[in-house]
A protein has these predicted regions:
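Alpha/propeptide regions of enzymes that mature by internal proteolysis
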Residues: 2, 12-19, 27-319
Length: 319
């Protein structure tokens, strides 16, 4: 994505991505109330009306955000989140999610959870029904079962086909062979077409309600074909999302390891605390990611980042 971009272009391109994300705002509200605003990654656009309706009805901002991302978590056509997400290298879908609630400044998360379609809702229960902030793996699954979440096979047939083709073409030294060109499934052929990239797919959503309170969530199936147990930034408070009810909310998608190393979402909120506008705060995080990207394998021949990150920022005043 960034092979032909200078560092300055990297920053400006990321800023442009901020403007291309879903942004929802309701009509004017009565005096004494805040104007509700929703900021989300592009795959959250179709959930805006539902979330705004909930906010207008007085639903908590975090609950509205979770209801919105649940639509995407259940969509088998979104292969970066929830049901139908691309699996790890062993063909198993592992999900990560986190939530933060502005009025109580509390948060919860789950990581590497299997067989549960709605990890964001489980993360909310971690926040509300335990003294912990993060549950992982088998412990997260047992907790979800305890609270009545049904287990489902998250691997759809389409995602299985994509994973299998990747498995069959991943090495020349094993005994697997991919199908011939005329036998290849059209879906697989399209997926691995000229524009194919190994994605870090995610959905983030930040909500500001009419009372001026904030809530946010980030949920993902993670890096395609990841090492089992790999956890990116999405379920880590401060990295994949962060908020302060007196300042604003932020979230991230893209290369999770870069956001983990720089606590990007926390960086954005703290920049807004110092008076930066949301866009400038997000660019501040971009600059930090670029400046600290020192490993040769993550830089092109000119020393520029060879990966992408996207940031989503919403200030307390609705900007």
């Amino acid at each position: 994505m960034l092979d032909s971009l200078s560092r300055r272009s990297f920053l400006s391109t990321t800023a442009a991505a901020l403007g291309a994300t879903a942004l929802g705002a309701a009509p004017p509200v009565p005096p004494g109330k805040s104007r509700p605003v929703i900021v989300a990654s592009a795959n959250g656009l179709r959930t805006m009306d539902k979330m705004m309706e909930l906010i207008r009805a007085g639903v908590d901002p975090l609950d509205a955000a979770i209801a919105g991302v649940a639509v995407v978590e259940a969509d088998p056509l979104d292969r970066t989140v929830g049901y139908g997400g691309i699996p790890n290298e062993e063909g198993v879908v592992e999900l990560d999610a986190a939530v933060m609630h502005g009025p109580t400044h509390s948060g919860g998360a789950v990581a590497s959870i299997r067989n549960i379609m709605h990890p964001a809702a489980v993360a909310r229960l971690v926040m509300k029904r335990t003294d912990h902030c993060l549950l992982v793996g088998e412990g997260a699954l047992k907790f979800a079962r305890m609270h009545g979440f049904p287990e489902v096979d998250l691997l759809t047939d389409d995602s299985r086909k994509i994973w299998l083709y990747w498995k069959e073409t991943n090495s020349r030294d094993d005994d697997r062979f991919p199908p011939s060109a005329d036998e290849m499934d059209p879906l697989v052929k399209e997926f691995f077409g000229p524009k194919y990239v190994r994605e870090h797919g995610t959905i983030h959503c930040s909500v500001l309600d009419t009372h001026g309170d904030l809530g946010c969530t980030t949920t993902t199936s993670g890096l395609f074909y990841k090492i089992p147990g790999r956890v990116g930034d999405s379920p880590i408070l401060g990295a994949g999302l962060y908020l302060d009810n007196e300042v604003g909310s932020a979230g991230s998608t893209g290369r999770g390891e870069a956001n983990l190393l720089n606590l990007s979402s926390h960086t954005i909120v703290e920049a807004m605390r110092r008076g930066m506008a949301p866009k400038d705060a997000a660019l501040e995080a971009c600059k930090r990611v670029a400046a600290t990207n020192r490993l040769p394998r993550l830089r092109d021949a000119k020393g520029r980042p060879n990966f992408g990150v996207n940031f989503y920022a919403l200030s307390k005043d609705g900007k």
